[in-house]
């Protein structure tokens, strides 16, 4: 996915109530890309060709590299703003790390995967290559994992690279407008 598609998916998921890391900015580097264009997936350029910047240049250019800037997950912003001086911060830990470090069991790991798959589907998306490194759990200051009311670890998507709408339609169809 292009950085613009990743941000669009993050906004779509957030609007659907699916927790994600916070998209902050997309930056186009000033220098030309050194990657040969033939190694890149060209579909992103085709799906974005009708979208342009105010000066008329395409928003996504083959000869440029882009950096996506995401918020660092260390707890809910509203909690951090209120309790920053009182409590230490939470920390994001991916599901693989949480399992490998003994914070969750293998069964809980599988439940987290199923939960993330279900959350994505509830928002009309899927990830055919979903990995445990693609979503975060929250490690609380007391070194326990934050849990839902049902006792399962809460999950927050942090990798949008392989997301797609269920059925495979592109995020930026010809007549669509990015959020």
Annotate each predicted stretch with a short phrase.
Residues 1-92, 122:
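Conserved ATP-binding subdomain of kinase catalytic cores across diverse folds
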Residues 2-5, 111-112, 129:
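Short, glycine/acidic-rich beta->alpha junctions
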Residues 13, 99, 125:
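Short, flexible active-site loop motifs that bind/organize anionic cofactors or intermediates
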Residues 31, 36-62, 124-178:
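Catalytic activation segment of kinase domains across protein kinase-like and atypical kinase folds
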Residues 98-101, 106, 174-179:
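Active-site activation/catalytic loop segments of kinase-like enzymes and analogous catalytic loops
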Residues 104-116:
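Conserved alphaE helix
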């Amino acid at each position: 996915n292009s950085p613009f598609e990743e941000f669009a998916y993050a906004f779509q998921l957030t609007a659907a109530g699916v927790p994600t890391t916070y998209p902050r900015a997309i930056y186009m580097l000033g220098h030309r890309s050194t990657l040969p264009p033939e190694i890149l997936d060209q579909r992103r350029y085709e799906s974005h060709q009708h979208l342009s910047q105010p000066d008329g240049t395409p928003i996504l250019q083959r000869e440029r590299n882009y950096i996506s800037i995401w918020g660092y997950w260390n707890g809910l912003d509203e909690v951090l703003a209120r309790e920053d001086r009182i409590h230490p911060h939470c920390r994001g830990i991916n599901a693989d790390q949480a399992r490998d470090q003994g914070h969750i069991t293998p069964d809980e790991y599988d439940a987290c995967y199923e939960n993330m798959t279900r959350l994505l589907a509830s928002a009309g998306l899927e990830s055919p290559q979903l990995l445990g490194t693609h979503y975060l759990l929250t490690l609380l200051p007391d070194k326990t994992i934050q849990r839902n009311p049902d006792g399962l670890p809460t999950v927050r998507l942090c990798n949008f690279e392989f997301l797609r709408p269920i059925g495979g339609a592109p995020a930026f169809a010809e007549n669509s407008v990015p959020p």
